[in-house]
Amino acid sequence: MQHDSSSNGSNTQNIMASILQSLPRESSLTKIEYEGPNIALYSDNPAYLLKNSQIISNMVNTLKKRIVIRTDESIRKSESETLALLRSCVSKEIQLDHTFFDPALGEATIYIKNPFGLISSIQGSNYEIVEKTGWKFKLRKKASNMHVMENIHRTLYETADERIQFYKDVGERIFRSKLSDSPAEASIVTLGGFAEVARSAMLLSTHESKILLDCGLNLFAKEPLDILPRLDITGIGINDLDAVVLSHAHLSHSGFLPFLFKYGYDGPVYCSEPTLPLMNLEQTEYIRKSNGDAIYSLEDIKTAVVHTIPLNLGIVTDISPDVKLTLTNSCHVLGSSMMHLHIGNGDHNVVYTGEMRFRDSILFTKPSFNFTRVETLIVESTYGNKEDIFPDYEIAIQRLVDSVNSTLSKKEVVLIPVPHIGLAQEISLIFDKYIALGRIVEAKILVEKVIADVSSIHEVYSEYLSEEINSRVYQDERSPFQSKHLTLVESHTLGSEPAIIICPLFTKDEEPLLHYLKQLSQRQESKIVLASYQMPGSLGRHIQEGKRQILLGGEEIQIRCIVEKIEGLDVHSDYSQLMSYVSKLRQKLRRVMVNHGERPKVQNLATSINRILKIQTQHPLVLEAIKLV
């Protein structure tokens, strides 16, 4: 992340002068510093600014910059004193054993079983607690399993000093003076995920900025050059990048990120809050399953954590001198985001959908399309064929329930291999609901541990989910993700009793799917249910296409059990939903670029958009450059 600090001076001075002129003496400002995309105001009387929030709101409206209030280090109590003060302010039954302090931000995050109960039991206002402790507080739901969050917080705590300097460097890079005030020029270079699924990556270039949108792997590619994004053809150095922005946590979109840090990238990574722990889990699992063949190390993953700046949805954020980013929920998986990129002084606006589901589901309410301006839309096409029409969601659920019941009634086993982020949680919730209603034959539901780990992160960030699920996470005695009907296992050995197994898909070594296939292969009345998209080259795709002989450790196994595909539950949009989404933006669009789909599906969707909606449409291959403006 190289830059010339000499170009920053006048711009920085203007920003700081405007802030100082706007602040009353009572604010007790001690310093102003860049904090990544934010401007941080440090005060030894932070309660004044927190109480008089209109002062900051007015400055934000004037400067068009994100401003945050920080407590000066001199007024912060020690962590032990702070916890003692907190405990004295709440009822005795409230447990504060999962409180994580972040010295870099002067914030403490309290994870608690009942956040509403803590709020109601606190004696005194939040402002008073900030005054007493010198720390700002965030409350979050305590998950059933906290180890992923604990690992993240441990890394952040250990690198607090490093992050303080990193945030300053990023801020100087973002708020540097522009090279030119001439109208923006912008282009996209396709590095992966075009006319193919996985290794999503593209480079957005302006005369001021270089921003990498997504950074994925294709673990099922046959050719080495098809596994990684083609950054080698961009002609730029790794530290010429201003930022990396991730749409979501799946390895197909985030799996290459630690490799960048391994080879020297030291810039920021932007994503939604839940994406940070989810991608950390995904990348760690990738190493664990790689048998020593991973392209990066756990240390590289930690470095990525340190350089990640999570963003709230719907907040406009400067990520370079001429690009502003806004993330909105794409409703694909927890934390998945569409990116709205505002280039220059309104010269051009790009929306990249990432992967999107444009309908309601048990986990999400369908995504918004309310963008003020969007000239270029980059839209996925996983199900871009005209024939890719899903049944109604409730009908799909009933078909799943009927399929499962038909097998369980014969005292047999149902195996459901699904991605462990997204559909695994939805199917678990569906089964929990229908068992409670007495509409599924009584049987054990076995869930692999990694799926439960992911579900725990859903509990922490339940505000990203549907209103109903969010309410249940906070208010029910038992979270819907901790159902009493689910049993956690790791590569379980099956007995003779009926069972439903929800196991992860898309792991590099195809485990634990192979483990269960070997046990089920000769049970002719057992069943494999395929409910998600199957990657080309994967074992799931081979089975879906009718292959019944597979190699296990050099031994050929014949799959004799039933294989059934259930349409309509996948976490993508079907053809009609994609067309509907594009049509909602039709009056604003100048161009649509279609990506993330097998080539025939990409071509079909692009042709349909052009023919039916009369919008200029492109479906580039990898290694193409497209001028936007």
Language model features with spans:
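Metallo-beta-lactamase
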Residues: 162-183, 280-336, 463-496, 562
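Active-site-proximal loop/helix segments of hydrolase catalytic cores
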Residues: 331-336, 342-374, 380-390, 512-516, ...
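Active-site neighborhood of phospho(di)ester-bond hydrolases with catalytic His/Asp-centered motifs
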Residues: 212-216, 241-257, 269-272, 327-331, ...
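Core dinuclear metal-dependent hydrolase active-site scaffold
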Residues: 156-239, 310-365, 492-493, 512-515, ...
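RNA-contacting regions in translation and RNA-metabolism proteins
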Residues: 1-119, 125-157
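Cap/insert and terminal regions of metallo-dependent hydrolase folds
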Residues: 359-447, 527-532, 550-612
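Pre-active-site segment of Zn-dependent metallo-hydrolases
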Residues: 194-199, 203-267, 271-277, 282-308, ...
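Hard-cation-handling environments
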Residues: 400-538, 550-551, 595
